[in-house]
Amino acid sequence: MRLLVLLWGCLLLPGYEALEGPEEISGFEGDTVSLQCTYREELRDHRKYWCRKGGILFSRCSGTIYAEEEGQETMKGRVSIRDSRQELSLIVTLWNLTLQDAGEYWCGVEKRGPDESLLISLFVFPGPCCPPSPSPTFQPLATTRLQPKAKAQQTQPPGLTSPGLYPAATTAKQGKTGAEAPPLPGTSQYGHERTSQYTGTSPHPATSPPAGSSRPPMQLDSTSAEDTSPALSSGSSKPRVSIPMVRILAPVLVLLSLLSAAGLIAFCSHLLLWRKEAQQATETQRNEKFCLSRLTAEEKEAPSQAPEGDVISMPPLHTSEEELGFSKFVSA
């Protein structure tokens, strides 16, 4: 168990704080956003890249862009990438965002073994490409007619009237030395006047924002995009540390392989032990058969040799003289 814990730690610790950067970046449709991924000193000379995350079951890169040498900017479509090795950072800029650009991207560094990578989410909000231009339409409420030998003044649009008063119009100069008519109360003496039929309302309600809420138009040019976009992207994001999915799944795969190897070793040892016991059993049976056949052969040979071998030599009898005399008397 301790060995597995050490192995797990060895697999996870090498990728810790290898890459740092924003977790999320966002922008409106048509904007330009820029982000910065910082890496460690030992990854200075390694190759950096930017790609979009794809795949369903297994993650893969699509549309990969590799950074060139020190300070050189590489562009592919609407994406540019630059490796600043002095600052240990990889700068990525996305131009003219579209709704299809929203998704997850990898900021990665190639190295021996699994690559160091950082997952970044891009959010694109719909918005107009340019601010709405006002198109005022003026409708004069009064007209003037020209008098003979008189310079008529151009008809001016109605002026702004006080709340609750009717709109008023200025009259033309009549005659060569005619006196100018005094302005009516509530009217303005300047040209290009506007009128409002209701108090507190705007002459263009379609283009005026509602009370209490206003959204300034956003315009980003090519010179100020790099300065304003990092502030926009970094305002709602914070640096984080990303651990690749491969490093998370690697300990599980190693554990499964160790368990399968242990099971295979136990099965093989059990199989060898069973085979050894079977061999010993066969040898024991073979020895028993051999001993039994030998005993039967010896038993068969024993009766044929028994009459000759069973003769017992008796020692000679010593008879006394009395017994000899008695035997002679009986025989006589």
Curated annotation (Swiss-Prot):
Superkingdom of the source species:
Eukaryota
Q: Which residues form a coiled coil?
A: none
Q: Does this entry carry the keyword Ribosomal protein?
A: no
Ranges that cross the membrane: 248-268
- PROSITE patterns (UniProt xref): IG_LIKE
Q: Which CDD domains match?
A: IgV_pIgR_like (cd05716)
Could you say which tissues express the protein in this record?
Highly expressed in heart, skeletal muscle and placenta.
All disulfide bonds of the chain are: 37-107
Q: Which GO terms describe its cellular component?
A: apical plasma membrane; basolateral plasma membrane; multivesicular body membrane; plasma membrane
Q: Which UniProt keywords apply?
A: Cell membrane, Disulfide bond, Endosome, Glycoprotein, Immunity, Immunoglobulin domain, Membrane, Receptor, Signal, Transmembrane, Transmembrane helix
Membrane topology label: Single-pass type I membrane protein
| Classification via InterPro entries | CD300_family_receptors, Ig-like_dom, Ig-like_dom_sf, Ig-like_fold, Ig_sub, Ig_V-set
The biased composition feature labelled Polar residues covers 186-205, 220-239
Point out the glycosylated residues in this chain.
Answer: 96, 137, 143-144, 155, 161, 170-171, 177, 187, 195-196, 199, 201-202, 207-208, 213-214, 222-224, 228-229, 237
SUPFAM superfamilies the UniProt entry points to: Immunoglobulin
Segments on the Cytoplasmic side according to the record's topology features: 269-332
Please list the residue ranges that the record places on the Extracellular side of the membrane. Answer: 19-247
Its chief place of residence is membrane
Disordered: annotated segments: 146-239
Which family does the UniProt entry place this protein in? Belongs to the CD300 family.
Q: State the domain notes.
A: Ig-like V-type domain mediates binding to lymphocyte.
- Name of the molecule in the record: CMRF35-like molecule 9
Q: Which organism is it from?
A: Homo sapiens
Q: Which gene encodes it?
A: CD300LG
